[in-house]
């Protein structure tokens, strides 16, 4: 077909109507409202959504529309929102008609790999059966490959995944997730897998200011509030915690808030006050954070 033949058809499609009908703006708005920062991630998700929407319009005009590669890789530290974004991505794919159900199934190596011969295939196939029509999110996917373990049955799980990713890509989207450096080695060791993953999204660590915003969102959801001094103390706590081992971004902040709530409850209980105001029950004081052992660590 000549280029002039392709563009000569004067059939029109309405982009705005299609955009409104699929209601993907609702999901994109939720991403912006629910997740602090992560600008590169949000931009990448918008780009993928735009491609899929335009692809949908091309199909309406009977233009060639190669099935876009939808399998993805989410890389980044723990607590950077990978699972939350995967849920939103599943919603977008469902609204645009690329998956039938739109659910997200989160698994790890233990859900896919058996401990003895003949156990891995049925486990992996059962997980895939549950995930069909939706998105399969494999967290810490690099644990599926252990080159130094001859008795490991991971390769069988990977082979089954490869077959399904290739042959049933209209029924299932797979997202592999984990630390960036480990995921890169995982793909190097499994070139067949790497070639089937078209979209790579890197999740940056949060800044201390972004983590403070996240903390405020979390306590508002639980109907608590910080005093001005507690605000400053939590920021100092966050900056110290970021330098410590096993820091997990928003996950570590959630844990810190849970402990601050416990200290607040104990402070109120120990005060012996018989009558409490609403303010007493909702206010987190600086001392509720300062009692963290982090402030007693040398060089913390």
Swiss-Prot record:
It is found in: Plastid, Chloroplast. The keyword Magnesium does not apply. The keyword Metal-binding does not apply. ATP binds at residues 76-83. Its main location: plastid. Signal peptide: none annotated. InterPro entries: AAA+_ATPase, AAA_lid_6, ATPase_AAA_core, CbxX/CfqX_mono, CbxX/CfxQ, CbxX/CfxQ_RuBisCO_ESX, P-loop_NTPase. Keywords: ATP-binding, Chloroplast, Nucleotide-binding, Plastid. It holds the Pfam family AAA. GO terms for molecular function: ATP binding; ATP hydrolysis activity. It comes from the Eukaryota. One of its GO terms (cellular component) is chloroplast. Belongs to the CbxX/CfxQ family. Necessary for the expression of RuBisCO. This is Protein CfxQ homolog. It comes from Pyropia yezoensis (Susabi-nori). The gene is cfxQ.
């Amino acid at each position: 077909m000549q280029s002039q033949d392709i563009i000569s058809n004067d059939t029109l499609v309405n982009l705005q109507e299609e955009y409104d009908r699929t209601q993907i703006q609702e999901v994109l708005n939720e991403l912006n409202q629910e997740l602090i920062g992560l600008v590169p991630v949000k931009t990448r998700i918008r780009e993928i959504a735009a491609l899929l929407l335009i692809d949908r319009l091309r199909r309406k005009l009977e233009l060639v529309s190669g099935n876009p590669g939808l399998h993805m890789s989410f890389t980044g530290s723990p607590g950077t929102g990978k699972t939350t974004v995967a849920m939103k991505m599943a919603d977008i794919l469902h609204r645009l008609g690329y998956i039938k159900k739109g659910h997200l199934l989160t698994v790890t190596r233990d859900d896919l790999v058996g401990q003895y011969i003949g156990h891995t295939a049925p486990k992996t196939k059962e997980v895939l059966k549950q995930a069909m029509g939706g998105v399969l999110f494999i967290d810490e996917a690099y644990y599926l490959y252990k080159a130094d373990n001859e008795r490991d049955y991971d390769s069988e799980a990977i082979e089954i995944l490869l077959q399904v990713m290739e042959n049933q890509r209209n029924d299932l989207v797979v997202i592999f997730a984990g630390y960036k450096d480990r995921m890169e080695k995982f793909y190097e060791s499994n070139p067949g897998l790497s070639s089937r993953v078209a979209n790579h999204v890197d999740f940056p660590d949060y800044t201390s200011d972004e983590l403070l915003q996240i903390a405020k969102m979390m306590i508002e959801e639980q109907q608590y509030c910080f005093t001005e001094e507690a605000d400053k103390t939590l920021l100092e706590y966050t900056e110290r915690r970021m330098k410590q081992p096993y820091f997990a971004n928003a996950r570590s902040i959630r844990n810190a808030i849970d402990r601050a709530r416990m200290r607040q409850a104990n402070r109120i209980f120990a005060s012996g006050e018989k009558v409490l105001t609403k303010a007493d029950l909702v206010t987190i004081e600086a001392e509720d954070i300062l009692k963290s052992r982090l402030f007693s660590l040398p060089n913390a």
